[in-house]
Every structure is written in C-alpha cells, then in structure tokens.
Amino acid sequence: VEAEKYLNKESIFASNTSTIPITSLAKNSHKPNNFIGIHFFSPVHRMKLIEIIKAKKTSSMTLLKTIKYAKKIKKTPIVVNDSPGFYTTRVFERYTNEGLTMIYEGQKAKSIEKSAIRAGYPVGPLAVIDEININLIANIRKHKYLENEKNNNKTKIFSSDKVIDIMIKKVNRTGRSGLGGFYEYPNQGKKFLWTNIEKYFPISKKQLSKIEMMDRFYFSQAIETIRCYEEGVIESVSDANIGSILGWGFPSSKGGTLKFVNDYGIPKFMARTQKLADKYGNRFAPPRLLQKLSESGKIF
C-alpha cells in the first residue's frame, strides 16, 4: 500500500514469494487487479523457469504483461492459480519430505541420496534441504500451520516434521549456511554426510531397495501434481511437465510428472499408487481424477 502511491495506474506489483497466497498479499492493495506472483528459482542466473501466479483479482492484462516480461528476460513462464505453495513448491516438497520420512523410518542416508541420483534427480533430497536451510523449511511450515488455524483446518504432524524438529532443537544443525545439516562442509574438499545421523535416527533392520525408494520419489510428486491439476491449481499439462523439470529437477528422462504417469500407463500407475498407499499412507492414495482416467481409458 505504501509503495503503490509512487506507481502509475498501469504499474504491476509482483511478489517473489514461493509459498504465501498472492490473494492474501493483494487484499490491502488499492489495485488488486495489478497484483501478481512472479516466482523465480534459485540460483536465478541458472534456473530458466518463472512460475506466474494469478490471484483472484489479477487481470488478464496484468497476466499478459507478466508473461511478456518473463520472455523478455529469457525465462520460461508457466501460469498457475493461487493456492498455498502454488504448484512448484507444493510438489517439490513431496521430494524433500519423502527423503525426511525415509530418514525417520530408519533408512540409511547414503542409500536415500544414491537412490535419488540414480532416479535422475540432480541432487539428493537431504542435500537439497541443506541448501534451502532447515530453519527456512521450519518457518514455511509455521506459516502453513497459521493458515490452517485461520481456515479452521486441523494441522497434522508428519514424520518429516519430527525430523526437522530434531535437527533444529536437538542438534542445532540447520544446513549449509549454519553449522552443517545432514552434510558436513569442510573448508577444503567435498561435502560428506554427517557421521552422527544414525545416532539421532537409528537404522532400521528393514532397508528398502533402491527401486522402492525411487518409486516413492517419482510417485509422491506425480500424485501431488495430479491433485494440483484436479484442484485447478495448474490447468496445463505441458506447464505441469515443464515446471517439474525446469523448476526443481524432476528427471528430464521422464518428460515431466504427468508425462511420467502417461508413459507408466494409467491403470498400472493407479495399481502401484494403491500398493504404496497401503504400505506408506494416504499421501500415495490415488486421486479421483486418476480413477476417472483409468476407467475411461484417457490420459493427461
């Protein structure tokens, strides 16, 4: 509101937030039709994607100008509708949360990271978490809790949340920018996994195969993408695929999250999700849209 008085009538007010709903940011604006989200990805000079977020009152002209701006600075834009976490953050979190959940289950950190690399991800989930910073992840989670309270929704505590709490409160390891996180960062030489991980997260006798771990990464993100598509958060299949590859490094060999589902085969994919859901919980439960596609023989 303070800044708006210095802008002309056609100026666009854009936020680079990766999680806070744009509509809630625009509610105090005198020109909510000129308010939009432009989510850049880090490191900005390397990452080609821009996620453009339409708020409830964002005008079509504001959207068009923002798309043109993205192309002018040689970025690839995708357009999504406003929702907590939007599309990319929401689906990307499935990758990191699955890694944290495996740690809580007693899977070896080295196996988790190796399985992710073998699956085609550029960086393992634990290394990504260290780069983001565990304190930042905790702050994002706190914001979600506040949003849930505001909307009278019950907040669930997941295994991944418990791992974050232990890393911050018990061992004070918050990532690369702190004293180290899941990895150690020597002044000279390469980073290596923290040797005390197993002290705080004991190893289970039952270790998963690399294929099982890989599937958990692929399927958790593909299922969340389907939910986003089902809810109208993202309306374009191509944007979903492009966003997943350019935004957070979903394996390009799979063609994107929804292309992965199509190529796997809808009925076969649905059967696998059900098995994963029976084993690991409702986060793998097949969305209704997937069931409808399976019954109709259609694809994304």
PLM region descriptions:
Residues 1-300:
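N-terminal glycine-rich phosphate-binding loop for ADP-containing cofactors
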